[in-house]
Amino acid sequence: MNSIKHSTEIPSTSTQSLVFEFTNLDDLYGFLNILQCREEYSFAQIRAFYNIPVDKKLLVNIQVKNPAQNLDYAWERRLKHHFRYMLDLEKLMWNLSTLGGAYSAMGDFDANYAKVAAKITAHQINLAKKYGDPVILARCYLYTALAEAQLGNLSHAVNIVRAIYHWAKQNPNTDIVQRCCEGVYQKLRAIHIFGKASSNK
């Protein structure tokens, strides 16, 4: 059981104790977060609800009642840290995807933009490896193929697309990768027909 004390500037003559019992960790963390963010307001509400005068010290005892099993707090903290880490990776990945897409679109007209898109894609590949999602990683390699084609390395780009398509055909739940391969391949055909962009110095 954990205790939280609260007193006001008025001299206290006695102490009144309350016991808050929780059977759900989400409720417990929500209560503790509210106390941390808005302590004075929260204790004022508690005093008003339980009719506790301000001249009394308030002692709030917090306990988890009858948990279904032994709670592994260390594992929970580790899991939360991992969850936040994965969310940060995902947010960064999609931010880079938006930025890379913009540079890739301009790469059709200026090879300098294609070079920047290739650098952004390299960062995405590193993040995808940390993220551990092979589908996202495969799509990043397709972005690399597109940048290579825009820079004039069409044969290398075609080889990348073929390798990713072969991998996708051999693995389940990769329909989106196969469709991406088909789309990128059509883009490569257009570059082959109309040529790559020049570099504007």
Swiss-Prot record:
Pfam families: DUF4807. InterPro entries: DUF4807 (IPR032072). This is Uncharacterized protein F58A4.6.
